[in-house]
């Protein structure tokens, strides 16, 4: 196979060719393409001429390489190549997609500097219609990802064991299997080894009851990547990191698994996670430093209404809470919002026409040491608005207070 020189310590890189296509979105036709090997002296194919001839040359160029790699190659490049000619169907046998790997390798904010993590995940190449540049950039991103996985394997081998199992369940997983085996120095783990790794990885970080039911679904191959993304986000939960929007869109089960594991109160006293993280009083103490809710107003059984409202909201119930002025209405939404952000990364949107009230809410939380609330209203300057929206996109905001007219803006 030796088309590429063995210049890397990672065998998988030496056995790969990077492909990038430029496609006319209206006609769904390829108008330019590039294929490159890892080292700069390796043969490369670049074409923006007769595409039929270029496709034939591309097919010949890829012979001898075990893997085709690319950024969004699974959902973009390979389908277009297969549509152009059936001879390219074989390329999909063992591809490696750097888009799919990036949330696992770089889940924490700041994310990889070349990937638009908080948007659609595309590369920040700075070049327009330059497939050769983008194809070479993919090697740079992949090498960074492998380096991150190697470090993860050193500090948390259970995480990489879990990823190796979860990401290699489909018929197209040969490339990912080669990559993880290369980094781990071991073949793909079996289901029991993966189960043990995930159990240890999530111990104390999720509800033990929900973890048991989730582990029972490990044989469901459709949940492989979603579960990997859920594990990756949970590893950085409680900070300012977000699950990429494209992951939530393409792998919706990932967010569902996070909610199931971290935002459901099982009610079992033996579950240390739920005792700590799903208890309204402990949440009140954590965020605002108070041991108890206000005793008044109370319901007919003497239970503080503040606590009842917070408890219902933390349990995900729909509710209407009405309290007199000066009885602490704000914490009735702030505690559930902060708790949910901490547990699942969810953003709570509060719609209010009162700009002064927004500022008062943010200042009140700031006095309690909470800096994760932002406002968007017509009184902000453009730099202030941009800063607020950036905090939302990057995962710095738990609560967004926004005026109704701002909802008309597409930004």
Annotate each predicted stretch with a short phrase.
Residues 39-112, 120-122, 131-149:
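Conserved DEDDh/DEDDy metal-dependent 3′-5′ exonuclease domain
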Residues 322-327, 332-377, 395-398:
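Conserved SF1/SF2 helicase motif Ia
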Residues 270-324:
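Conserved pre-motif I regulatory segment
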Residues 220-279:
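Interdomain "pre-motor" coupling segment immediately N-terminal to P-loop NTPase/helicase cores
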Residues 311, 315, 338, 363, ...:
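Conserved helix/coil segment N-terminal to the catalytic DExD/H
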Residues 114-208, 212, 217, 222:
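Acidic, Mg2+-coordinating catalytic module of metal-dependent nucleases/exonucleases
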Residues 14-24:
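Two-metal-ion RNase H-like nuclease active-site motif
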Residues 1-13:
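N-terminal accessory regions of nucleic-acid-interacting proteins
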């Amino acid at each position: 196979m030796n088309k590429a020189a063995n210049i890397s310590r990672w065998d998988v890189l030496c056995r790969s060719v990077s492909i990038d296509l430029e496609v006319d979105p209206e006609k769904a036709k390829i108008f330019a393409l590039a294929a490159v090997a890892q080292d700069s002296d390796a043969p490369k194919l670049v074409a923006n001429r007769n595409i039929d001839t270029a496709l034939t040359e591309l097919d010949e160029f890829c012979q001898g390489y075990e893997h085709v790699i690319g950024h969004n190659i699974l959902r973009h490049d390979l389908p277009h190549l297969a549509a152009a000619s059936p001879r390219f169907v074989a390329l999909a046998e063992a591809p490696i997609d750097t888009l799919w790997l990036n949330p696992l390798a770089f889940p924490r904010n700041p994310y990889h500097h070349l990937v638009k993590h908080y948007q659609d995940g595309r590369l920040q190449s700075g070049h327009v219609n330059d497939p050769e540049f983008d194809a070479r950039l993919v090697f740079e991103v992949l090498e960074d990802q492998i380096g991150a996985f190697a470090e993860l394997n050193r500090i948390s081998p259970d995480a990489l064991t879990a990823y190796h199992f979860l990401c290699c369940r489909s018929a197209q997983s040969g490339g990912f299997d080669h990559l993880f085996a290369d980094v781990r120095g071991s073949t793909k783990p079996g289901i029991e080894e993966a189960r043990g790794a995930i159990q240890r990885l999530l111990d104390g970080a999720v509800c033990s009851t929900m973890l048991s039911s989730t582990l029972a679904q490990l044989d469901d191959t459709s949940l492989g990547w979603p579960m990997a993304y859920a594990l990756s986000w949970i590893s950085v939960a409680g900070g300012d990191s977000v699950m990429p929007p494209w992951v939530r869109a393409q792998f919706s089960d990932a967010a569902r698994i996070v909610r199931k594991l971290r935002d459901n109160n099982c009610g079992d006293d033996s579950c240390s996670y739920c005792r700590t993280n799903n208890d309204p009083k402990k949440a009140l103490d954590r965020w605002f430093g108070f041991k108890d809710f206000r005793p008044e107003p109370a319901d007919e059984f003497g239970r503080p209404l503040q606590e009842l409202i917070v408890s219902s909201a933390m349990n995900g119930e729909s509710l209407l809470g009405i309290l007199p002025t000066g009885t602490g209405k704000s914490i009735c939404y702030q505690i559930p919002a902060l708790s949910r952000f901490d547990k699942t990364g969810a953003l709570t949107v509060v719609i209010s026409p009162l700009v002064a009230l927004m500022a008062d809410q943010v200042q009140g939380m700031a006095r309690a040491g909470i800096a994760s609330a932002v406002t968007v209203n017509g009184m902000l300057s453009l730099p202030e608005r941009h800063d607020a929206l950036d905090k939302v996109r990057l995962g710095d905001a738990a609560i967004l207070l926004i005026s109704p007219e701002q909802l008309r803006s597409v930004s």
